[in-house]
């Protein structure tokens, strides 16, 4: 009987310690953020899912439309979330709010730079050129490794160095 009482007392003490100290919640548990509605990283790149996207001054339909994008698959950067709304930035630095349903996780980028950009057959500077692009061409991103991204443009796949693309971060890797 004495062993059972000791066991119950020790169990109760351990229960109180775990409850009062917050054990089981994780030492680095992230607190709920009312501005975040997903667990995806912020900032992150996405693309427009529709050929007509209203950009508003705030996160809701009650806010006036600032402008309208008419380019499906245009890359944009999500810089803030509020409920179903996303604050985005485009390649020119323009910022506004769009409904999350008008965005897609499919990755696109835009070629940038002052010179002609070469799309190569392999992720190497000495690789055979496949295409030459001017700035402002939209490309589908398939994967990014180190300093290269595998892209598709005009039904041709190849590799472009990340520093010639807007729509991917310098250290970002994905496939």
PLM regions and their residue ranges:
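Bacterial N-terminal signal peptides
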Residues: 10-22
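Bacterial N-terminal signal peptides that target proteins for export
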Residues: 1-12
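Non-catalytic, beta-strand-enriched accessory regions in extracellular/secretory proteins
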Residues: 64-66
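A subset of signal/propeptide-processing and intrinsically disordered low-complexity segments
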Residues: 4, 23-25, 121
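Second-shell loop/turn segments in exported
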Residues: 60-62
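SH3-family beta-barrel domains
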Residues: 27-57, 68-72, 79-94, 98-121, ...
């Amino acid at each position: 009987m004495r062993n059972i009482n000791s066991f119950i007392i020790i169990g109760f003490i351990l229960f109180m310690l775990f409850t009062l100290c917050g054990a089981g919640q994780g030492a680095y548990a992230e607190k709920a953020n009312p501005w975040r509605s997903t667990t995806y990283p912020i900032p992150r790149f996405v693309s427009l899912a529709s050929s007509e996207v209203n950009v508003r001054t705030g996160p809701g339909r009650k806010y006036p439309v600032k402008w309208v994008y008419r380019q499906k698959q245009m890359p944009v950067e999500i810089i803030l979330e509020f409920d179903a709304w996303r604050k985005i930035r485009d390649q020119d630095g323009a910022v506004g709010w769009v409904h999350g349903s008008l965005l897609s996780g499919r990755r696109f980028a835009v070629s940038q730079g002052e010179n002609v950009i070469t799309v190569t057959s392999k992720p190497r500077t000495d690789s055979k050129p496949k295409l030459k692009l001017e700035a402002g061409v939209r490309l589908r991103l398939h994967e990014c490794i180190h300093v290269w991204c595998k892209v598709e443009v005009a039904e041709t796949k190849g590799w472009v160095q990340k520093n010639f693309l807007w729509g991917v971060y310098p250290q970002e890797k994905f496939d």
